[in-house]
From Swiss-Prot:
Enzyme Commission (EC) number: 1.2.1.41
InterPro entries referenced in this protein's UniProt entry, alphabetically: Ald_DH/histidinol_DH, Ald_DH_C, Ald_DH_N, Aldehyde_DH_dom, G-glutamylP_reductase_CS, Glu-5-SA_DH, GPR_dom
Protein name, UniProt field: Gamma-glutamyl phosphate reductase
Gene: proA
Subcellular location: Cytoplasm
NCBIfam families: PRK00197.1, proA
Length: 417
């Protein structure tokens, strides 16, 4: 049953992809505006359905971070609609071309951006991904299969109804955006075998989900891996600036992948900065896990071993370590970072440039909060995820990351000798 359903869903999506691949930017934008309008019109219904998911999640004991991701408020529903309108304002990359070469025989060689085809998005308690991914894939000329976790299934279906309303009003097949009707693991496994119809899989979620999808899929996978993001306070840091960025990165919103999970402090400024951090983090009720060189600065902190870092807390918790020097910070990040986002605070331009050049992560920042590691904040509009895979996309994935390039060769009757 699951095998047949997975094949049917994938086949319908592949057929629908052909319908959207050739739409003009003007036509796609008109449909997207209808999607935004439909989400606004259905706000009350979406929130009502979401309350059922929240009640179920509470009964099942979901973590505070998961519940935060799951919850839809009027502001968040409006945010989904606004994100679609931001996508409308973005230039459509499909059809863009550039000349590579003109051969001696007169052939013209170009490369042109084209849609990927069918994208399968697998995610957990993030109903907003339904709207974001649906709109991004549509604008980039792709069909999308959305498989959300059981935590958000009803909310995602309600959002999909709004998107389908816009598609049907535009005489387009609903299969352009498909929400898998059940979170059944067997069905997901079968979807990951549909290499004849699905072109790319993007998982967003916990470590277990990412590993399962990567190990099971016969289709190329771009991972949205966990966010173990670090803040390194250099010996030449502005400490007031560092404190503000620490608090923003750790406490503004904890259950997101661009929140800070690790604090590294150069030993030359530890005596001054760590007491500042201890006071400010205590006021925000942040639990501290610190190495033996740092633990005494914090009341009630627990000491952790040197090999116990690298945890994605997604809560008011942070790991703290004092490092000997810049090289010590880099070594720590290389060992315990997840390749998501890393931040340095320093007034030394050469050190900042070196950090940006040497740190191996999808996003590297100097003197700004990790919370800006987000497609919308970086000018991409809504993002489909933050890739930690070094494939054609690395970092926040906007429209262009959902396309590929093909060669276009034009001539005037040339034949090969």
């Amino acid at each position: 049953m699951s095998q047949q359903l997975a094949k049917e869903i994938s086949q319908r999506a592949a057929k629908a992809a052909r319908a959207v691949a050739t739409l003009s930017e003007t036509d796609k934008n008109a449909v997207l505006q209808k999607m935004a309008d439909a989400i606004r019109a259905r706000q009350d219904k979406i929130i009502e359905v979401n309350k059922k998911d929240l009640a179920t999640g509470k009964e099942k004991g979901l973590s505070d971070a998961m519940m935060d991701r799951l919850e839809l408020t009027p502001e968040r529903v409006e945010g989904m609609a606004s994100a679609i309108e931001e996508i409308i304002a973005l230039k459509d990359p499909v059809g863009d071309s550039y000349v590579l070469d003109e051969r001696p025989n007169g052939m013209k060689i170009e490369k042109m951006r084209i849609p990927l085809g069918v994208i399968c998005m697998i995610y957990e308690a993030r109903p907003n991904v339904t709207a974001d991914a649906g709109a991004l894939c549509f604008k980039s000329g792709n069909a999308v299969i959305l498989r959300c976790g059981r935590e958000a299934i009803e909310s995602s279906k309600a959002i999909a109804e709004a998107l389908h309303e816009a598609l049907e009003a535009s005489n387009l097949p609903k299969d352009v955006i498909t929400v898998v009707p059940t979170p059944d693991r067997e069905l997901m496994t079968e979807l990951l075998q549909q290499k004849d119809y699905i072109d790319l899989v993007i998982p967003r979620g916990g470590e277990g989900l990412i590993h399962f999808v990567s190990d099971t899929s016969k289709i190329p996978v771009i991972q949205h891996y966990k966010g173990v993001c670090h803040l390194y306070v250099d010996k030449d840091a502005d400490l007031d600036k560092a404190l503000a960025i620490l608090l923003n990165g750790k406490t503004q919103r904890t259950g997101v992948c661009n929140a800070l999970e690790g604090l590294l402090v150069h030993q030359d400024v530890a005596d001054k900065f760590l007491p500042m951090a201890a006071k400010a983090l205590a006021e925000k009720d942040v639990t501290i896990h610190a190495d033996k060189r740092s633990v005494s600065y914090f009341d009630g902190a627990d000491e952790i071993a040197d090999d116990a870092f690298g945890e994605e807390y997604l809560a008011l918790e942070i790991a703290v370590r004092t490092v000997d020097n810049y090289e010590g910070a880099i070594e720590h990040i290389q060992e315990f970072g997840s390749g998501h986002t890393e931040v340095i605070i320093t007034e030394n331009d050469e050190t900042a440039k070196r950090f940006i050049r040497e740190v191996d992560s999808a996003v590297t920042m100097a003197n700004v909060s990790s919370r800006f590691s987000d497609g919308g904040q970086l000018g991409l509009g809504a993002e489909i995820g933050i890739s930690t895979s070094k494939l054609h996309a690395y970092g926040p994935m906007g429209l262009e990351a959902l396309t590929t390039e093909k060669f276009v060769v034009t001539g005037n009757g040339q034949v090969r000798d």
